[in-house]
Curated annotation (Swiss-Prot):
Keyword Nucleotidyltransferase applies: no
Tissue-specific expression: Coelomic liquid (at protein level). Expressed in large fat cells in contact with coelomic cavities, in intestinal epithelia and at the epidermis level.
Record's note on what induces expression: After blood meal ingestion and upon bacterial challenge.
Keywords: Antimicrobial, Secreted, Signal
Cellular-component GO terms for this entry: extracellular region
Highest taxon in the source lineage: Eukaryota
Protein name listed in UniProt: Theromyzin
Primary subcellular site in the record, as a coarse category: secreted
Compartment(s) where it occurs, according to its Swiss-Prot or TrEMBL record: Secreted
Job description of the protein: Has bacteriostatic activity against M.luteus. No activity toward E.coli and F.oxysporum.
Signal peptide from the UniProt entry: 1-21
Length: 107
C-alpha cells in the first residue's frame, strides 16, 4: 500500500507536466503538438520535484518513476489518460534517458 501512495505522488508530477503541456498547446495549434515537452524541460521539472522529495522517500519514488517510464508499471487509474499520450510520444531511447536521469538523484 505504501508503494502505491509513493507511485501516486511521483506520477502526480507526471500528470502536472501533462496538464501543463495540454494547457499550453491545446488552443488549435495541432501543428505544434510535437513541441509539448522537450527532454530538457521534463528533466528540469523532475529535478525540481526530486529536490523537494524527502530523502527517505526518494528511492521508492525514483523506482516507481523508472517502472512507469520503462513500461513496468501501469498508470494509476486516477491519473488522466493524457499522461500516457505524452509518454507515447517519447522514443524508447528518450524514456530510457529519463529513467537513467532519475537514477542520478540517488547519489
Amino acid at each position: 500500500m505504501h508503494a502505491k501512495i509513493i507511485l501516486a505522488l511521483f506520477l502526480g508530477m507526471t500528470a502536472f507536466l501533462a496538464v501543463q503541456a495540454d494547457h499550453h498547446h491545446d488552443h488549435g495549434h495541432d501543428d505544434h503538438e510535437h513541441e509539448e515537452l522537450t527532454l530538457e524541460k521534463i528533466k528540469e521539472k523532475i529535478k525540481d520535484y526530486a529536490d523537494k522529495t524527502p530523502v527517505d522517500q526518494l528511492t521508492e519514488r525514483v523506482q516507481a518513476g523508472r517502472d512507469y517510464l520503462l513500461g513496468k508499471g501501469a498508470r494509476p487509474s486516477h491519473l488522466p489518460a493524457r499522461v500516457d499520450r505524452h509518454l507515447s510520444k517519447l522514443t524508447a531511447a528518450e524514456k530510457q534517458e529519463l529513467a537513467d536521469y532519475l537514477l542520478t538523484f540517488l547519489h
